[in-house]
């Protein structure tokens, strides 16, 4: 029986058709359409990683055809109009050859035209990248000319571990890339999220894969990350004030932190929290790597046109939208527009401190609208909630200024737990100021306390230690410290929400 003619499409090349030919799972003469080669050449020149991998597979098919004594031929068609897959189907229809693919749509269309189809099935073996991970591995880093390394541990507490002692070659990394790209059609929840000149981002099940190649980088590089922790909101051991605010009041939420500190993990927990409260939750991600219940719709920013997500979210009316990885002006503009439209927003940004995260909004909006857009800022460090700010607006004389006619709208950034202002945001002249007021408040409070106590006990001294005001009374003036003074100090504590302690010479604080 003569060998059949096999015409692979791009998906078959990416899946590694040569492996099936070599182990005789599939047998036949190999036909490569000229239109496919032209498309791959153009894409390779544009820097697409998938095209280069596919061209390497064509070369491999030619090599094994010589060893296996099967024909390898470049074929062409008279009619090259239409899509590549359409041209391949037309050729198979006219020449009675078999199309080889991993694409279900290609298979269905070919079968409807009575074209023989071979749908490549995935191998049952464990993926190479899965062997690089254990239960503590956060990410694996592969770079041409460097030994493979893994980051093991948890956010904020990890170490870099060498996986092998031998440096990787470009061939080693291409083999890993080939396996990743060939698995996209078979591994659940997998897709190529972004493909640009020199870079490709793939979501492969739980793994997020970033592939970089020359000329964008100085060599082939693959970074594979995987979430090591999935937590419920209740597992963060948050203060009840924060939990109550998230449940009842917060609608303009900003989650900030350094890369790898657990921001997305917290955002994921928050999205599930609102879903359990029967809220309609949607996400905007790039890439889509959050693992959420099916009730949550996840949108990709990369596949949407400008304005498309804005229209979709306004018309679908979610209660909350999680915006993961806000980076550029377009991201912040969409967050602001949706929040002002009344949609609850949860934004995730990179920042080294919570005030830095707020600063990224300052030049994009009017100061008077800040609390309407941002009401709660959560700073994540080492996988835990490290700081929470609430934002409110008032009209007052900014702390540190004295003249009454300097009163103006001031946004107070308060520690949510202690309810004490730590920063004030206001316009001074033409510049928007972000002023730390904690020390300023301490100094002014201390001055008022000194004035009051020195009118009664002239030689008493006041210091601020460990969050308390310490009044030290000299031995010869102890008699002036009476019930009247104690009453005044208690009223002062209550009025200014501070703690005062009195110290006598050679005695412990009282």
From Swiss-Prot:
The record's keywords, sorted A to Z, are:
ATP-binding, DNA damage, DNA recombination, DNA repair, DNA-binding, Hydrolase, Nucleotide-binding
The EC designation for this entry is: 3.6.4.12
**EC category name:** hydrolase
Phenotype upon knockout is: A single deletion is mildly cold-sensitive (growth at 55 Celsius versus 65 or 75 degrees). No change in sensitivity to mitomycin C. Double hjc-pina and hje-pina mutants grow more slowly at 55 degrees Celsius and do not grow to the same cell density as wild-type.
Per its record, the protein catalyses: ATP + H2O = ADP + phosphate + H(+)
One GO molecular function term of this record is:
ATP binding
Q: Output one GO BP term.
A: DNA recombination
Q: Which Gene3D superfamilies match?
A: 5'-nuclease, P-loop containing nucleotide triphosphate hydrolases
Answer whether the UniProt record assigns the keyword Nucleotidyltransferase to this protein: no
Q: How does it assemble?
A: Homohexamer. Interacts with Holliday junction resolvase Hjc, interacts with helicase Hjm (Hel308).
Its annotated function is as follows:
Important for growth at low temperatures (less than 65 degrees Celsius in this organism). Promotes Holliday junction (HJ) branch migration and unwinds Y-shaped DNA (but not replication forks or dsDNA) in an ATP hydrolysis-dependent manner. Stimulates cleavage by HJ resolvase Hjc. Hjc, Hjm (Hel308) and PINA coordinate HJ migration and cleavage of replication forks in a coordinated way. Probably acts as an ATP-dependent pump that pulls DNA through the hexamer.
This chain belongs to the protein called Holliday junction branch migration ATPase PINA
What is the primary gene name for this protein?
Answer: pina
């Amino acid at each position: 029986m003569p060998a059949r003619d096999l015409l692979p499409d791009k998906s078959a090349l990416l899946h590694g058709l040569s492996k099936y030919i070599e182990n005789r799972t599939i047998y036949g003469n190999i036909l490569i359409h000229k239109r496919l080669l032209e498309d791959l050449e153009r894409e390779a020149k544009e820097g697409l990683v998938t095209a280069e991998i596919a061209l390497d597979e064509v070369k491999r098919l030619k090599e094994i055809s010589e060893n296996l004594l099967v024909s390898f031929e470049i074929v062409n068609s008279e009619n090259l109009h239409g899509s590549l897959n359409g041209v391949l189907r037309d050729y198979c229809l006219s020449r009675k050859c078999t199309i080889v693919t991993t694409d279900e749509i290609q298979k269905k269309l070919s079968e409807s035209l009575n074209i023989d189809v071979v749908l490549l099935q995935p191998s049952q073996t464990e993926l190479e990248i899965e062997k690089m991970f254990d239960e503590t591995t956060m990410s694996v880093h592969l770079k041409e000319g460097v030994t493979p390394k893994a980051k093991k541990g948890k956010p904020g507490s990890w170490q870099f571990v060498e996986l092998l002692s031998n440096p990787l070659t470009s061939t080693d990394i291409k083999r890993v890339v080939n396996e990743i790209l060939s698995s996209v059609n078979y591994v659940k929840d997998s897709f190529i999220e972004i493909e640009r000149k020199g870079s490709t981002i793939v979501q492969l099940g739980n793994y997020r894969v970033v592939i970089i190649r020359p000329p964008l980088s100085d060599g082939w590089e693959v970074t594979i990350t995987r979430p090591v922790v999935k937590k419920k909101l209740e597992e963060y051991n948050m203060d009840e004030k924060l939990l109550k605010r998230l449940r009842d009041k917060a609608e303009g939420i900003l989650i900030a932190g350094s890369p790898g500190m657990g921001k997305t993990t917290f955002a994921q927990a928050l999205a599930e929290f609102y879903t359990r409260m029967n809220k309609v939750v949607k996400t905007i991600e790039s890439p889509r790597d959050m693992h959420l219940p099916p009730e949550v719709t996840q949108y990709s920013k990369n596949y949407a046109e400008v304005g498309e997500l804005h229209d979709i979210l306004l018309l679908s009316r979610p209660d909350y939208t999680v915006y993961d990885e806000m980076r550029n002006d377009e991201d912040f503009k969409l967050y602001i527009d949706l929040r002002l439209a009344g949609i609850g927003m949860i934004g995730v940004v990179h920042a080294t401190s919570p005030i830095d995260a707020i600063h990224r909004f300052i030049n994009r909006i009017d100061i008077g609208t800040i609390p309407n857009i941002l009401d709660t800022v959560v700073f994540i460090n080492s996988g835990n909630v490290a700081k929470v700010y609430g934002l409110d607006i008032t009209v007052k004389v900014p702390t540190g200024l004295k003249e009454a006619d300097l009163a103006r709208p001031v946004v107070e950034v308060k520690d949510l737990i202690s309810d004490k202002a730590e920063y004030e945001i206001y316009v001074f002249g033409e510049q928007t100021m972000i002023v730390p007021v904690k020390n300023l408040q301490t100094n002014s409070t201390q001055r008022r306390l000194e004035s009051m106590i020195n009118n009664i006990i002239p030689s008493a001294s006041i210091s601020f230690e460990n969050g308390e005001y310490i009044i030290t009374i000299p031995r010869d003036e102890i008699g002036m410290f009476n019930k009247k003074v104690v009453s005044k100090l208690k009223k002062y504590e209550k009025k200014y929400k501070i703690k005062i302690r009195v110290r006598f010479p050679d005695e412990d604080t009282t």
